[in-house]
Amino acid sequence: MIRKNFDVIVIGGGHAGVEATFALAKMNLKVALITIYKDKIGAMPCNPSIGGPAKGIITKEIDALGGVQGYYADKAMIQVKMLNESKGPSVRAIRAQIDKEKYSEIIVKDLLQNENVTIFEDFATDLIVENDQIVGVELEKNKTISSNLVVMTTGTYMNSRILRGSDIEHTGPNGEKTGIGLSKALERLGFELIRLKTGTPPRIYSDSIDFSKVEEEVLDVNGYVFSPRSNVKIDKQIHCYLTYTNEKTHKIIQDNINKSAMYSQLIEGTGPRYCPSVEDKIMKFADKERHQIFFEPETSRQDIMYINGLSTSFPVEVQKQIVKTIPGLENARVKIWGYAIEYDAINPLQLKKSLESKKIKGLFLAGQINGTSGYEEAAAQGLIAGINAGLKFKGEDEIVIQRNHGYIGVLIDDLVTKGTQEPYRMLTSRAEYRLLLRNDNVDIRLAHYGLKAHLISQQDYQKILEKYKKIDEKIEELKTKFVSSKTDFAQKYKIENGISYFQALTRPDIEPSDLIKDFEFLNEMTIQIRLEGYIKKQNNAAAKMERLENLKIPEKIDYSQILNLANEAREKFNKIRPQTIGQASRISGINPADIQMLLFYLDLKKSKHEN
């Protein structure tokens, strides 16, 4: 049966699918959201947290663009802290423990009330394509939904299987449904698939844990939020707990290593480098006497603990032995045993920077299907794919976030330029302009993209511009005001006459609020003042990069026509099809001589065209 045509179809209701759906609905488009389980939209199948190094900044960037992850995380958070607070502003990031049930419930409630969203509790089995243009999606319950725009956000559900030792189940996360239909469809359409793996630890009933044997983590009382729109303040935060592996743990793992699905070569997929299983940590870091294990509550009820650091692919009988060696878990009752999960993804080199497929017009892909790991990375891609699908529907230009404007820009550029052979996780070290990509300036960095995407109002955008105008004016004022050596402030910080307020604020030992009272943007201004020289350097470097980004490469360029271009460069340019000179220059193995040849060829073609 052919159903009513939708403006856009979103396949998958995870973190990427949620962002895409909300963005498209806010752009006033009619969206069909296909999800296997309606009550599990926005579910957190792995860790019950959002944020962390770099990731927390991504969540704030999503919010600055008009996305929803930070807003719902605030509404469901049960604990929040600022990581790396003693370090520089560029590496500080929020991490929040989330009530995973509440998070999903409030998302589902808002989607069900959204008149632009129709939810299909069904399973997508095929993509319908005509003349390299997506035209619809086939569903398991004998329906076809039609649209010229589809956003695929299938997560780890494509051709997935769960492994605990030699015990293999062909299911999705937590024993949920999987299917091979979409994998076959993508292969039929010429996509290169890759096989990836991730894992998850056991979940333990809290009433079986001896908390007297573990360390209670200190709570951060500052009350941070991801989204200023949420108006949230947590009255009472909930503790996490810290313990460690030990000699007994390590011996059991070493003695049984061949029973691990990963070490017995049952797993074909590549696992995440920066989130290794416990057996990987013990085998690769044999010199370490212990590894951290965190007990993290999954909900505000605190009845189930997520055992962070104990991800594993061992069979249940070995997991039982391992769990009993962990202090506090000697008598633990387990709700869910740990497992590894393998799934299909695509090589992301097959995508444009808009996250539209290069092969099939109107088909966008986002999230773990593109080779990433993490809720934050998935949500960021879902938002950009949703925005660009919506802009395509409206006949407007796509948005591409530059590397100096956001971690989201770094993430997508890395994927579509370098590709990945393992689950990609965002790290601060991946961003060459990380001093520009801070928590405190996400609004001014990204609001203009949100405005262009119709997710930020003109009124809200003007407020942001006004904020930074006030900061600039205040900075100029501080340069003309001087500290008197007779004040208590001067005595406290041993300041003599002749120093301006601006110069005083450059000193890291000075508490800004001791000098300036009642300025609402004091934190943002202080960071700007103290990093001024470094920011200027990075802005200059970014400006050079942006000039290369503005040099577009024709979509149908024939690289075989470029004389003196190295064979490796020709092969890589043909495979990746870079959209700009800047992107071409970042491809692995490409050197300055290759770029010079490419520029010379483009100039020659331009001259011939003009003549």
UniProtKB/Swiss-Prot annotation:
Residues binding FAD, per UniProt:
12-17
**Which keywords does this Swiss-Prot/TrEMBL entry list?**
Cytoplasm, FAD, Flavoprotein, NAD, tRNA processing
Q: Which InterPro entries match?
A: FAD/NAD-bd_sf, GIDA_C_N, MnmG, MnmG-rel, MnmG-rel_CS, MnmG_C, MnmG_C_subdom, MnmG_C_subdom_sf
**A GO biological-process term:** tRNA wobble uridine modification
Quick one: which residues bind NAD(+)?
271-285
The keyword RNA-binding is assigned to this record: no
Q: List the disulfide bonds.
A: none
Which GO terms fall under molecular function for this chain's record?
flavin adenine dinucleotide binding
Which is one Gene Ontology cellular component term of this protein? cytosol
Subunit structure comment from the entry? Homodimer. Heterotetramer of two MnmE and two MnmG subunits.
Q: Describe its function.
A: NAD-binding protein involved in the addition of a carboxymethylaminomethyl (cmnm) group at the wobble position (U34) of certain tRNAs, forming tRNA-cmnm(5)s(2)U34.
Family annotation (PANTHER family): GLUCOSE INHIBITED DIVISION PROTEIN A (PTHR11806), PROTEIN MTO1 HOMOLOG, MITOCHONDRIAL (PTHR11806:SF0)
User: Which family is this protein grouped under?
Assistant: Belongs to the MnmG family.
Q: What is this protein called?
A: tRNA uridine 5-carboxymethylaminomethyl modification enzyme MnmG
Q: What is the lineage of its organism?
A: Bacteria, Bacillati, Mycoplasmatota, Mycoplasmoidales, Metamycoplasmataceae
